[in-house]
Amino acid sequence: LEQLGRGSFLKRYTNTYSRDEEKLIQSVSKAVQYMAKRRIGALIVFEKETGLQDYIETGIPMNSDISQELLTNVFIPNTPLHDGAMIIQGSKIAVAASYLPLSDSVKISKSLGTRHRAAVGISEVSDAFTVVVSEETGDISVTFDGKLRRDISKDVFEELLAEHWFGAHFQKKGVNS
């Protein structure tokens, strides 16, 4: 009842992920929302079962804890790490500024740039989950299983991130749920 009174009950989720995982999800989500609002382009790859070592070797090693501030800072334009992809392994930022394969798919709109082609490309050759923030529009897109989902909401983004990063079914639970 105390949680209900404070409103925090409505913000809880129906899965079994840990507080650490929730903190990571929120750090990534806040960074992505911040960059989207300011049209700071970003490409973040979450390694799953398929190893991404070949692509990790093309980047600049970081081996850093994930934080909203670090995620945002890496993609600030005209800084040494902002071009290329950030690859996350588990709960660590493995590298930044890594090169990814570009998709040759004719299904990708010509209006989309290199970040989107790279996001689809890595999802065609691996099971990685990838987040793209468009510097042109500020839209947030994700790729997985060779598919691109464009212009998704914060809630959908968090749900997909949790599902693909931690395998959790991440849905907000309301009073009548």
Regions found by a protein language model. Name each.
Residues L1-S177:
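Divalent-cation
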